[in-house]
């Protein structure tokens, strides 16, 4: 660099070395200008113009370190406005250098730096977009190729889809893949257009031309899976895959596979034809055997008959059979013998022999000369030879049609095999038995043989078994027959496996309800052949049949060597079936009258307080029972409890108070801190006394518990409360019956889990209540009910009957009960009707399977408000109504009319519409929710104090229940009733204020600590003078000052340290 542009003075050189920046080091100059320099930068920076247009520094400092590497950015000084020559200093005008204003120069340099950064980021972004665009093109090519392959596969599979179910499923799968590929192609195309808008230009067109050339190429192997189309492979690859050649070209010798001959008697595919063919074949072979034996026994030698030529192998001599072939031949003879023996019993199910389970149907293409999978042993062959010879003796020698005859029962080595029927529970009726006499009369010691009317009579035997013969109908046809004809009594339906039993079954079912009903079976099973097994063994069915004419077997016809053998009784429990004739008609019945006698309202003639109403249930007898057994239990543990009735009422008041004033820990009721301290509780009972009573609370004697009753610890209290709840039942006609959950999270055998309930874990109680929520009767659920009364009606129905009997015993009359589908059945309605009551309830589908109502699927397709109904001869009506879903209701006290209109919102019309509703649905909705209302009232202010023992939750529930019942009576008979919370508060205040015992005055305990947050807040901590000296909270010396806010003694000098954290 020339040195004429540098000032000659040493001072100027030093300043230029400190302040000026060369053009080649523009990055450092920009950083220093942004940071503001060191405060000594002058106003002007001079550059000298060079002929090549590059600006050089006016300063050259020898001590400056050169920059390593090429420059990242060159500043174009021509883009920066220079200072006018007239405004330059006189010393600079004669030097011929460019002079710039410092602010202008800084702005110009920063602007060029920003532009360079923006261009660099733009270039980097274009590179990324270009890479993404290439990836999109690859995806587009792959997706297009897959679509072409899928279209070809669809063209190949479409002609075969109508004939094959498997190919139809594959075709559906391919179409779903095509739809997914089309959606993917749309997304890729949209992304391609977006990237084209960013890139634009010729490069995109070049790529598109390249992609269009690739579309004309032949597609490669399919990658859609083996279910779509096999991959094209060469002959070499096929040999390697099948194991005929190694990958190195070596041929592998293959063993000839001999397919075993499969023999099976297929009863469902032409069994009679099979018997005829086998009989003919057996006749021909046994005829040849007879001729051979006759030739061997002849005295003179005879010419042996010519060997029988095989049709499959003509012009060949008969070869000597091997040992295995002889065994196979004897085995076939055995099959033929069995076929001849059982030809008279065509259609009867027979027991499968052990070796028949391994047999499979003969495959197509199997020759007769191939070996079978089963070969009998030598012992079996020897035993069967005698039987075959005896059968061959009866064969005629001519070529006439062969007549089947019974095999002779004699024989030296005849094996006796007991015949076992398929239906073990089938026994002939007593009317079919004939008279018999003992065997060996006078000789003694003879055996006894049973003799029945059908022995030896083939026609009558078939007539007796005809109800059990399978019918060649489909399962769907059999179910339609049972629904339309009520006279058919079926004991079982036997379903054969479908043809595609191993194929995957679709999840789509014909019904949408849970359970094993006919509406839940798939279509493949509905079209399967099935057998209808009817109750043909019943003696009544024989006598009722007019075409039945029993044969008169007199005692003279029975040989004297026979005696009667009684069949054993059947183990199968016969259910009593009620056959009803249903018709479409409405129920016309008058509602029940309700209670006969009026309730004793003497107590409610005067206004009663909440406590007095509660003590109708928790009277002196109940409280004395609790006090007695609690003291007894404490005494057995060596603790002197000394509980009294007054003290228990105070304890019960604290329990009720915890329902609407809950704290995380029950001990917090007795704390002295002002945020949780409860004056009413702490003044009524000491904390430790409450804990002692709660841990020893009992209502039964542990030494005399019923081992069968799982709730025997609570049974005395439950029984007494049931008596009092039933005594004060309001005068109602309609009562609901439902279940009630008590929360419990411990371990117990009776704990239940009910999904979808507000309380999922806990004990379940069966409750009968009025429509407003007064619980009349309750029992805990403990699995198997120890009370076996009415158990023939089921668990739910027996509980309803027990409740109705208890209600009728306490208040004679006729009532209307409402319950849900767990309890409802036609048998329960009949039983309640016989007791003079009426009932209404939703019913499950399997409880009314014989009622010919319109199906749920058909009703759902119709408009809302459509219903179908039927009535039987006993006054029970069943109605199926379509609302949001299809609901089925059965009733013996409410019919269809009068119809009412209810408001429903229509999603289709986007407005509320009027829907007609049968009267029995209205009755159910109006009177069903009594137990749920009681559950809501109790759960709203449930006691928050819990115990660790399993019986603490149901015990406290009993107290909550009677408190809720007392409030229901208060609402019924009081002219100015209060809500449940106010009623509860009045009971609590009365018990704690009347029966509470305030603690005796004694030594004052340690004062509670002040809140730490208010100690260090620095607000209103004023030091004031106090009357007497106390210990300073900081230095623990005596002082007459204290902090008014913290209420602690403090010196003035200690105040700052105490209030500083």
Swiss-Prot record:
Cross-link (Glycyl lysine isopeptide (Lys-Gly) (interchain with G-Cter in SUMO2)): 255
The keyword Nucleus is annotated on this UniProt entry: yes
GO molecular function, one term: sequence-specific DNA binding
UniProt tissue specificity: Expressed in heart and oocytes, but not in granulosa cells (at protein level).
Modified residues (Phosphoserine): 158, 429-430, 554
Effect of residue 746 to D: In POF11; weaker cellular response to DNA damage as indicated by delayed recruitment of mutant protein to DNA damaged sites, compared to ERCC6 isoform 1; no effect on interaction with RNA polymerase II either after UV or H(2)O(2) damage
InterPro entries: PGBD, PiggyBac_TE-derived
Subcellular location as annotated: Nucleus
Polar residues composition bias: residue spans: 8-27
Gene Ontology CC entries for this record: nuclear body; nucleoplasm
Skewed-composition ranges (Acidic residues): 364-392, 506-515
Any Pfam family the entry gives: DDE_Tnp_1_7
Record keywords, A-Z: Disease variant, Isopeptide bond, Nucleus, Phosphoprotein, Premature ovarian failure, Ubl conjugation
Gene Ontology BP, a term: positive regulation of defense response to virus by host
Effect of residue 1056 to I: In POF11; weaker cellular response to DNA damage as indicated by delayed recruitment of mutant protein to DNA damaged sites, compared to ERCC6 isoform 1; no effect on interaction with RNA polymerase II either after UV or H(2)O(2) damage
Region Disordered: start-end pairs: 1-39, 287-323, 344-466, 494-521, 537-573
Bias (Basic and acidic residues): 353-363, 451-462
Disease cited in the entry: Premature ovarian failure 11: An ovarian disorder defined as the cessation of ovarian function under the age of 40 years. It is characterized by oligomenorrhea or amenorrhea, in the presence of elevated levels of serum gonadotropins and low estradiol.
Biological role stated in the UniProt entry: Involved in repair of DNA damage following UV irradiation, acting either in the absence of ERCC6 or synergistically with ERCC6. Involved in the regulation of gene expression. In the absence of ERCC6, induces the expression of genes characteristic of interferon-like antiviral responses. This response is almost completely suppressed in the presence of ERCC6. In the presence of ERCC6, regulates the expression of genes involved in metabolism regulation, including IGFBP5 and IGFBP7.
UniProt protein name: Chimeric ERCC6-PGBD3 protein
Organism, as annotated: Homo sapiens (Human)
Gene that specifies this protein: ERCC6
């Amino acid at each position: 660099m020339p040195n004429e542009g540098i000032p000659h003075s040493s001072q100027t050189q030093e300043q230029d070395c400190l302040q000026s920046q060369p053009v080649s080091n523009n990055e450092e100059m920009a950083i220093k200008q942004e940071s503001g320099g060191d405060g000594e930068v002058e106003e002007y920076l001079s550059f000298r113009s060079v002929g090549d247009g590059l600006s050089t520094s006016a300063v050259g400092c020898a001590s400056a370190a050169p920059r390593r590497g090429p420059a990242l950015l060159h500043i174009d000084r021509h883009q920066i406005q220079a200072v006018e020559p007239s405004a330059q200093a006189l010393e600079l005008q004669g030097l011929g250098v460019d002079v710039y204003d410092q602010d202008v120069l800084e702005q110009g340099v920063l602007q060029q730096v920003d532009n360079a950064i923006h261009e660099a980021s733009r270039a980097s972004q274009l590179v990324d977009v270009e890479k993404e665009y290439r990836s999109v093109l690859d995806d587009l090519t792959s997706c297009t190729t897959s679509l072409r392959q899928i279209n070809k596969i669809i063209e190949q599979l479409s002609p075969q889809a109508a004939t094959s179910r498997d190919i139809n499923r594959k075709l559906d799968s391919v179409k779903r893949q095509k739809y997914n590929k089309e959606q993917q192609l749309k997304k890729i195309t949209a992304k391609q257009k977006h990237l084209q808008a960013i890139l634009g230009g010729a490069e995109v067109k070049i790529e598109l031309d390249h992609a269009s050339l690739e579309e004309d190429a032949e597609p490669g192997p399919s990658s859609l899976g083996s279910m779509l189309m096999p991959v094209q492979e060469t002959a070499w690859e096929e040999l390697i895959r099948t194991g005929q050649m190694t990958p190195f070209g070596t041929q592998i010798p293959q063993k000839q596979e001999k397919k075993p001959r499969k023999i099976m008697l297929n009863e469902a595919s032409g069994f009679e034809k099979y018997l005829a063919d086998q009989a003919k074949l057996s006749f021909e072979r046994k005829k040849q055997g007879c001729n051979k034996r006759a030739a061997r026994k002849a005295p003179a030698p005879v010419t042996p008959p010519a060997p029988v030529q095989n049709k499959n192998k003509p012009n060949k001599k008969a070869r000597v059979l091997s040992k295995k072939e002889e065994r196979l031949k004897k085995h076939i003879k055995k099959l033929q013998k069995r076929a001849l023996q059982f030809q008279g019993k065509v259609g009867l199910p027979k027991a499968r022999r052990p070796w028949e389970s391994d047999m499979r149907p003969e495959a197509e293409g199997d020759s007769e000369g191939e070996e079978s999978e089963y070969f009998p042993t030598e012992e079996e062959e020897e035993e069967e030879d005698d039987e075959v010879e005896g059968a061959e003796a009866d064969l005629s020698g001519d070529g006439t049609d062969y007549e089947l005859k019974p095999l002779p029962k004699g024989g030296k080595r005849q094996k006796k095999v007991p015949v076992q029927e398929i239906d073990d529970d089938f026994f002939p009726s007593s009317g079919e038995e004939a008279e018999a006499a003992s065997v060996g009369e006078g000789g003694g010691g003879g055996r006894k043989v049973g003799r029945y009317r059908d022995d030896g009579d083939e026609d009558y035997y078939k007539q007796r078994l005809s109800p059990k013969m399978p019918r060649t109908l489909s399962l769907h046809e059999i179910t339609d027959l049972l629904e339309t004809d009520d006279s058919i009594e079926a004991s079982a339906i036997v379903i054969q496996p479908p043809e595609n039993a191993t194929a995957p079954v679709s999840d789509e079912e014909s019904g949408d309800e849970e359970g094993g009903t006919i509406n839940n079976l798939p279509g493949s099973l509905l079209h399967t052949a099935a057998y209808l097994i009817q109750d043909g063994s019943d003696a009544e069915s024989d006598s009722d049949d007019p075409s039945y004419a029993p044969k008169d077997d007199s005692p003279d016809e029975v040989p004297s060597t026979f005696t009667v053998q009684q069949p054993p009784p059947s183990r199968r429990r016969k259910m009593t079936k009620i056959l009803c004739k249903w018709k479409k008609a409405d129920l016309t019945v008058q509602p029940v009258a309700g209670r006969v006698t009026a309730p004793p309202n003497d107590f409610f003639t005067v206004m009663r307080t909440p406590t007095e109403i509660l003590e109708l249930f928790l009277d002196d007898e109940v409280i004395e029972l609790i006090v007695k057994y609690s003291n007894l239990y404490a005494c057995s543990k060596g603790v002197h409890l000394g509980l009294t009735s007054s003290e228990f009422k105070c304890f019960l008041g604290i329990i009720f108070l915890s329902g609407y004033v809950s704290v995380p820990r029950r001990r917090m009721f007795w704390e002295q801190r002002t945020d949780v301290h409860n004056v009413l509780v702490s003044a009524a009972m000491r904390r430790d006394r409450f804990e002692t009573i709660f841990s020893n609370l009992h209502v039964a004697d542990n030494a005399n518990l019923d081992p069968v009753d799982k709730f025997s610890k609570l049974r005395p209290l439950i029984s007494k409360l049931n008596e009092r709840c039933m005594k004060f039942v309001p005068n109602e006609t309609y009562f609901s019956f439902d279940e009630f959950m008590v929360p419990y999270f411990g371990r117990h055998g009776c704990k239940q889990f009910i999904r979808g309930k507000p309380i999922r874990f806990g004990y379940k109680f069966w409750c009968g209540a009025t429509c407003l929520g007064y619980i009349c009767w309750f029992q805990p659920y403990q699995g198997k009910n120890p009370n076996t009364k009415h158990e023939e009606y089921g668990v739910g129905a027996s509980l309803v009957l027990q409740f109705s009997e208890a209600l009728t015993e306490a208040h004679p009359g006729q009532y209307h009960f409402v319950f849900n589908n767990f309890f409802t059945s036609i048998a329960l309605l009949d039983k309640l009707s016989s007791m003079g009551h009426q009932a209404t309830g939703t019913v499950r589908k399997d409880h009314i399977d014989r009622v010919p109502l319109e199906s749920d699927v058909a009703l759902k397709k119709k408009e809302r408000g459509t219903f179908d109904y039927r009535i039987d001869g006993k006054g029970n009506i069943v109605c199926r109504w379509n609302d949001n879903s299809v609901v089925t209701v059965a009733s013996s006290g409410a019919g269809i009319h009068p119809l009412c209109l209810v408001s429903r919102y229509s999603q289709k019309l986007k407005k509320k519409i009027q829907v007609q509703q049968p009267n029995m649905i209205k009755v159910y909705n109006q009177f069903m929710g009594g137990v749920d209302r009681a559950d809501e009232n109790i759960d709203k202010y449930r006691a928050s104090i819990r115990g660790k023992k399993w019986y603490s939750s149901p015990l406290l529930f009993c107290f909550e229940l009677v408190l809720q019942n007392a409030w229901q009576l208060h609402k019924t008979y009081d002219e100015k009733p209060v809500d449940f919370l106010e009623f509860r508060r009045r009971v609590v205040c009365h018990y704690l204020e009347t029966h509470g015992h305030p603690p005796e005055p004694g030594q004052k305990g340690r004062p509670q600590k002040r809140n730490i947050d208010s100690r260090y807040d620095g607000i209103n901590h004023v030091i004031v003078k106090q009357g007497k000296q106390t210990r300073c909270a900081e230095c623990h010396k005596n002082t007459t000052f204290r902090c008014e806010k913290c209420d602690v003694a403090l010196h003035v000098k200690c105040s700052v340290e105490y209030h500083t954290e």
